[in-house]
């Protein structure tokens, strides 16, 4: 019922929702925008149709290693990731579209279009047209762009004529809001007299602090590239290019230009992508300018990583999402320009993150204040921010680090973030979200956005839901990498993939129940390349390495074994020489590669410099971090629980978790863990007692589906320490 209701809302035409005057204005402004770009509506239509059969050739992105595109990887249904992709396709993206309708996102474009057709209209002096009165944030436009991006990824794997037509109707409204010179920023265009308070009096005047004009550009370009690749239509791509060209004319180092850089980074990545799609180097040059000029303009602010030039930066600091996007952008530009100084810079910063500022769940950003990184080893648990968007940015960064260096340690970090720090941000049904992701909760502290203690279907600042809308559908693209004749098996999931190796196809069929067990089977269904090799990542957690630093280590005596065989013959190799990969050489059609990883329950301790984790242990199994939630433990005070110094664990298959937070959503199953513990309990009269407790733990991503209650990841091991 919920799915049908959401879809019915999504399939409404955006134009149908507009008042008659705005609808007419949008249609007229669309024609005007096309005319100003010297492209008639008819010609644009012909061009769009032609491009469907003759697409622009995408340039090499410059990386030594290549990502296998998500369109080449078909995730099996009814698997761990199959369920997540289905939820994104059937719930998350449609929900985001419906929220764009109900939360004034489309209306902003319609109002901007009306003003363009009626400059100086009487409404501009009324409170109804005072932008700050109805637009929550100056970047609200990006919710539309990000959702279109995610929907475009879905269209490439699950063609849907109705969704395609719906997006087309939305783009009519978006294009109608574009000014004649290409500028597209509804926070100003709606009412130049009274723009959004963050916009500044003139273009670019607050772009380094609050306006987000270039942040909007970045998400627009990313979405437009995705839409073009999905549909062959240039409709959105031409809109985005016109805005990018406007920026290039007005922002840069030349006389008469505004010498500014983005206050919120992402345009760097997006413009590099636009360059590889179009071959127009001006977009790469602008991306490099944004990076090179950072720290040299009038604004010097660590919050936005603009306190010093990027080549002098060595520590992750400031707003964690902006930072992650910038570091990923540095990698993209470094790959395209062969800039070794850029690579040295992100190597330094990456090392700082994973050795001093990285949560066990793969999240980053310790502080609510500024949504920012803290100082070295500042990793509080209950007040951890760990924004979902920051986790997604870390996935982007670690994938790019792999593409630069071919080292499995980056995929180890990517996997940790993905299975814990990213998907914790979205409920299993795909319809509710966390903004921050703490590692403990008392059930009362309102850590989530908008002052809540549970996942919510949307936020006033909705960057995380719309970001998940675009990220999750692209997830299959992170499974494999390629270089020459080597295929890198980076992540493990049931899938069938068609991989281009030296211009010929290799087809792999993988079956596994990972992350619930460590058994993986890969069948080579086709190999058109003689001498192709499969390089299997042996995860860090198998090799007794929590993270590639001394920030965390395993504290138990377990020594997980692993094995790889081809057609029953064991394969051996030097993991160190192959950067954590085990080569399976000369694969051919019909080969069966079997991989086994022992998956014992492990205990983890943190570096003693992490104050909040001293004297405590965390519990992991495979790539999953576990937590205890009061609802699974008879309401026991989980925050005052103590596990044994050498705990024994049992694994419970098929442990059912109800999803009471989402109406009509089904229960789901996980592998739970149990161990003996003691709980320091305080009665109503103040008397304190110690009780034995069979402690049940569930995967961290699965918590908070049954209402607000206590949750904890790090557990004391000494009752006396807790009593103090």
Where are the model-predicted features located?
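Flexible glycine/proline-rich, aromatic-decorated loop/lid segments
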Residues: 303, 357-376
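Helix-capping and short linker residues that terminate individual alpha-solenoid repeat units
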Residues: 159, 175-179, 232, 248-252, ...
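Aromatic (Trp/Tyr) and acidic
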Residues: 54-161, 165, 195-230, 265-282, ...
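C-terminal beta-rich recognition modules with glycine/proline-rich loops and embedded aromatic residues
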Residues: 346, 412-420, 425-523, 543-569, ...
